A protein has these predicted regions:
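Glycine-rich anion/phosphate-binding loop at the beta-strand->alpha-helix junction
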Residues: 1-116
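Catalytic-core signal marking the mid-to-C-terminal active-site face
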Residues: 111-171
Length: 171
């Protein structure tokens, strides 16, 4: 964080008012491997702290997501991709980068980008929340159908069925 603040000061001294995106990547280094573990909660906590600092300064923030320590696209990769993307999005990160990085950022693959893109779609749906409106509640349709019939034949159901339930593209 100190390096980012120093960069901000130098940047603004050179060009007052110039755009600046706040953020820094990092966590405690794993001294066994001499690598920074992308998948660790420590990395995510750092991203959360940077997002909070950026918000207090009124600046946009970047962070990482869709990253893993795993060398393969396996269960660990899926869990770490999902955790990191969801945490970054919920923190309000404006620019999420490194999507698709494997093996603590040492490798990447097109397959991991596809998985990352799919999980980004999932996170966007989750962050958007529920659409609660007169149209989506459809109380008039509920009253019209009544307790003993079904909703499958209703135009409202047909209009909303495919866009309400998230569907994966690649998985």
């Amino acid at each position: 964080a100190a390096e980012c603040l120093a960069g901000l000061v130098m940047h603004q001294a050179q060009r007052p008012g110039a755009p600046f995106i706040f953020g820094a990547c990092g966590s405690p280094m794993d001294m066994r491997t001499m690598l920074f573990p992308y998948g660790s909660p420590d990395w995510r906590l750092n991203d959360l702290a940077m997002a909070e600092m950026a918000r207090s300064y009124g600046l946009p923030v970047f962070g990482t997501g869709g990253t893993t320590d795993s060398k393969l696209l396996d269960a660990q990769a899926g869990m770490e991709f999902a955790n990191s993307l969801l945490i970054a999005a919920m923190a309000g990160t404006n620019l999420i980068h490194d999507v698709g990085y494997l093996d603590t950022g040492l490798t990447g693959s097109l397959e991991s980008l596809v998985l990352g893109a799919e999980q980004i779609r999932w996170v966007k749906k989750f962050i958007a929340g529920l659409d609660v409106s007169e149209e989506t509640l459809a109380l008039d349709v509920i009253r019209a159908v009544g307790p003993a019939r079904h909703f499958m034949a209703q135009g409202h159901t047909r209009r909303h069925l495919r866009k309400t339930l998230w569907q994966p593209y690649a998985l």
